[in-house]
Amino acid sequence: MQPTRILQGLKYRKLRLTTKDVNKGFYKGNRTGSMGTHTSYGTYKIDYTKVRTYVCPDLTGFKLTPFVSKTIRPVHDQFPGDKLGPKNPATYLARWKSENGLD
């Protein structure tokens, strides 16, 4: 039995790894690199010179705005005379029936 023509001419490592190769001990990885080292005590020490940091540019005078306005205040429902408040199952079912219509 002989290897295929591709494997005869090239080294196997130059070929792209497939899902069938992964189970045979090859680690494909996702090209992120290591952010530190493993110590002899079983812990991982982060090397902060390898950690990626992203600097946000100056946004003064930036023309795009966020999707949600910062001036809108959150609305809290009022439950007068109800001890459980929003946790009351009867209130939840009544609101669900009023909004959806069907039981």
Curated annotation (Swiss-Prot):
Component of the mitochondrial ribosome (mitoribosome), a dedicated translation machinery responsible for the synthesis of mitochondrial genome-encoded proteins, including at least some of the essential transmembrane subunits of the mitochondrial respiratory chain. The mitoribosomes are attached to the mitochondrial inner membrane and translation products are cotranslationally integrated into the membrane. One of its GO terms (molecular function) is structural constituent of ribosome. The keyword Transcription regulation does not apply. Keywords: Mitochondrion, Ribonucleoprotein, Ribosomal protein, Transit peptide. This is Large ribosomal subunit protein mL41. It holds the Pfam family MRP-L27. GO terms for cellular component: mitochondrial large ribosomal subunit. Its main location: mitochondrion. Component of the mitochondrial large ribosomal subunit (mt-LSU). Mature N.crassa 74S mitochondrial ribosomes consist of a small (37S) and a large (54S) subunit. The 37S small subunit contains a 16S ribosomal RNA (16S mt-rRNA) and 32 different proteins. The 54S large subunit contains a 23S rRNA (23S mt-rRNA) and 42 different proteins. It comes from the Eukaryota. The keyword Disulfide bond does not apply. Belongs to the mitochondrion-specific ribosomal protein mL41 family. InterPro entries: Ribosomal_mL41. It is found in: Mitochondrion. One of its GO terms (biological process) is translation.
